Amino acid sequence: MTRKEALADLIAKVEAGERPDNQMIADALHIADARRVYVAKATEGSLDAAKALHEAVLPGWIVHDFSQNSRSMGWNIVLASKSGTYSTSHQSGNVGFCDNPARAWLIAILRALHAQES
């Protein structure tokens, strides 16, 4: 399985509202064990964990938009790269949409990483 495929599987798991196991996280994110816990904690609603993961795996990227959608009451997170490119739709490569802001941030992080894979 490629890293891109592993990231796609991890994104699907998180989008489904499920907590991924440590092996799934390890396959998708090549980060130290201590940082893998950020993924689990972000799925449970920790904004601190989502922020820590963002800083660890996407250095220099910023949160361009962090808002709640008034119609669906879900959260939209848009991340911008160092060059200033960003997405404006939750269907795009680096935007997360979810009823939990930390999980939405995690989805945006994972989609940004997925988009970077060739």
Placement of each model-derived feature along the sequence:
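Short, hydrophobic/amphipathic alpha-helical patches that form generic packing surfaces
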Residues: 12-13, 23-31, 103-114
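Short acidic (Asp/Glu) and glycine-rich catalytic loops that position anionic groups and cofactors
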Residues: 5-7, 33-34
